[in-house]
Amino acid sequence: MKTLVLLSSILGDRSKSKALADHFLARMCEHEPASDITVRDLAAQPVPYFDAETAGALFTPADARSDAQRAIVALSDALIAELQAAERVVFAVPTYNFNLPAQLKSYLDYVARAGITFRYTPEGVPEGLLQGKQVYVLIARGGKALGTPQDSMTPYLKQMLGFLGMQDVTVIAAEGMAMGEFAAAEGLAQAKARIDELLPQLA
């Protein structure tokens, strides 16, 4: 299965969310040796912030775009094509100040394109166009908030992904990463165990 992995931690190999993604991929390859995997590190190669110049480029007719605007649209097109091609998408997401990293938000802004990844019906109802994908959101969090009012990140991600048509979303969280060595090890082990439970069901 064609799998796209999106890393977003600034900590590189010290990242707990990356550790979850690495574990996921290792187990996935055991069950699917012929997996076609693409990894995009949004921290190592960040997507520019979605600013006025970006919006202007996307809303300017193709034949009227400047070279700079064409480059912006080309990046958005490439990110979208990569996402469209994937049958499975794995988001490795650290929690920064109760929310997702800015680099992941920028990515989502670049792939949310009216008429390409979502559209509105004649009745004004939004319809996501990135349908039929398995999505796994692997979260690392310093404290413990999953399923509580303190967790605003998970509902946002589910809403945003659902808006784009990705409704089959499984969330796995390693919590307590900043609550001491024992709590961190326990939280990571529990998340990895949950991945191990799910992997045989992926196909």
Swiss-Prot record:
Top EC class per UniProt?
Answer: oxidoreductase
Q: Give the enzyme's EC designation.
A: 1.6.5.-, 1.7.1.17
Identify the residues that bind FMN: S9, S15, K16, S17
**Keyword set for this entry?**
Flavoprotein, FMN, NAD, Oxidoreductase
Q: Does the keyword NAD apply?
A: yes
Q: What GO annotations for molecular function exist for this entry? A: electron transfer activity; FMN binding; oxidoreductase activity, acting on NAD(P)H as acceptor; oxidoreductase activity, acting on NAD(P)H, quinone or similar compound as acceptor
Which cofactors are required for activity?
FMN
* Quaternary organization: Homodimer.
What name goes with this protein? FMN-dependent NADH:quinone oxidoreductase
Question: Organism, per UniProt?
Answer: Bordetella avium (strain 197N)
Q: Report the gene name.
A: azoR
